[in-house]
């Protein structure tokens, strides 16, 4: 498995070959290197293979050549949303707001919300089936499932339940990734590392969240923003010449977590009793979390400052500029953020993907949801280069330069 040093990107579109030097190296920050294959590749499985090669194992038997020459590409996408739609006019019936007020400040017109009978696992499984169908991959051929969510329906994770719903008979490894609105981006990078360093062939990456369950529906500052959805992509191993994952850039800043969170609630009564010398805290009480708390102004400043920097860093590692990309695909948080980032990157509006108006902020689902809609509508075509970025609570943010198909 690839370590925290990241993955490499051996190839680029043929149309860009004159502008970019293909690379296979890995540098310490986890990005592409244009210096060729480094003398040491930071994958334990590869290092072990090098020892075997030194001992006389033939190159055809060596795992080094298989992994170093291995790329990965996105071959299928899918999405699913709940049937229940909540419009801005619906919200205006129980909070002091209006369609004009919400749309002007966020770009959102409606959102989809899970009802009491709905399951996030079912929604994720539906999105996954759609992605597998497009990729022409059978559930039994899945090697790994990554469920990117901050709202699992089981404390220990929902990925195994998605695996069960899909009927994967080979019991592939399935686990959750929790990184809020950046979750899908981390899942995509993790999938690439698993393919390149771990020998996996078909990895299913799902972004699914039901933030409606953690929203204070009396707070017009947050309840207007969020919707529920699921999106998925199939990441598949390929030859290095077909590689579609060029570079990535990932960050987190715990100091900014106070601006966007849903924290564990403390019992102030117990704390007061403890100050009087009594034994408290046992047996532990059932935990509960606050609703989503957000300082909108600070989150906006964070996004418009850090996201362009992250995308530019990823582009630089890939040997590209913003003029080389076909599409800019950001986490669908707020249209003002999307527009501001596009302006800073000098990407024209006609090359920006946005479906925020119809779904709201769907957290980890937003990027694959928008991608699926753009692919199925014919807007995004095979071979298109996409600069994509997720950002949110933590604070976490990250970008990746990918090729579709």
Swiss-Prot record:
Gene3D superfamilies from the UniProt entry: 3.40.47.10
CDD domains: KAS_III (cd00830)
GO aspect biological process, one term: fatty acid biosynthetic process
Protein name per its UniProtKB record: Beta-ketoacyl-[acyl-carrier-protein] synthase III, chloroplastic
Subcellular location: Plastid, Chloroplast
GO molecular function, one term: 3-oxoacyl-[acyl-carrier-protein] synthase activity
This protein's record includes keyword Translocase: no
Keyword Transferase: yes
Family: Belongs to the thiolase-like superfamily. FabH family.
Coarse class of the protein's main subcellular location: plastid
Known EC number: 2.3.1.180
């Amino acid at each position: 498995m690839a370590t925290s040093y990241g993955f490499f990107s051996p190839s680029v579109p043929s149309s860009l070959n004159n502008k970019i030097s293909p690379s296979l190296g890995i540098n310490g920050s986890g990005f592409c290197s244009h210096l060729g294959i480094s003398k040491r590749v930071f994958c334990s499985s590869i290092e072990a293979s090098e020892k075997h090669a030194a001992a006389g194992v033939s190159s055809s038997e060596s795992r080094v050549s298989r992994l170093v020459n291995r790329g990965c590409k996105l071959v299928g996408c899918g999405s699913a949303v709940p049937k229940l739609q909540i419009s801005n006019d619906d919200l205006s019936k129980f909070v002091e707001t209006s369609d004009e007020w919400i749309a002007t400040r966020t770009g959102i017109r409606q959102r989809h919300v899970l009802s009491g009978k709905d399951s996030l696992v079912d929604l994720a499984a539906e999105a996954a089936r759609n992605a597998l169908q497009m990729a022409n991959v059978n559930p039994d051929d899945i090697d790994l499932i990554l469920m990117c969510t901050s709202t699992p329906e089981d404390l220990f994770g929902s990925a195994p339940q998605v695996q069960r719903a899909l009927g994967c008979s080979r019991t592939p490894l399935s686990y959750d990734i929790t990184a809020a609105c950046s979750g899908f981006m981390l899942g995509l990078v993790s999938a690439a590392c698993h393919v390149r360093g771990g020998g996996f062939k078909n990895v299913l990456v799902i972004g699914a969240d039901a933030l409606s369950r953690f929203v204070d529906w009396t707070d017009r500052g947050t309840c207007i923003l969020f919707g529920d959805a699921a999106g998925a992509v199939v990441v598949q191993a390929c030859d290095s010449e077909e590689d579609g994952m060029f570079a990535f850039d990932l960050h987190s800043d715990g100091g900014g977590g106070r601006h966007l969170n849903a924290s564990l609630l403390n019992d102030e009564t117990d704390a007061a009793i403890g100050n009087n010398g009594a034994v408290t805290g046992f047996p532990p009480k059932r935990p509960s979390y606050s609703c989503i708390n957000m300082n909108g102004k600070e989150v906006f400043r964070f996004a418009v400052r850090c996201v362009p920097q992250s995308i530019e860093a990823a582009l630089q590692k890939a040997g590209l500029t913003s003029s080389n990309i076909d599409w800019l695909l950001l986490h669908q948080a707020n249209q003002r953020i999307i527009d501001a980032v596009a302006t800073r990157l000098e990407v024209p509006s006609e090359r920006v993907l946005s479906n925020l108006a119809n779904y709201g902020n769907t957290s980890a689902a937003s990027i694959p949801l928008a991608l699926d809609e753009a692919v199925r509508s014919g807007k995004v075509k095979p071979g298109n280069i996409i600069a994509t970025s997720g950002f949110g609570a933590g604070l976490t943010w990250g970008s990746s330069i990918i090729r579709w198909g």
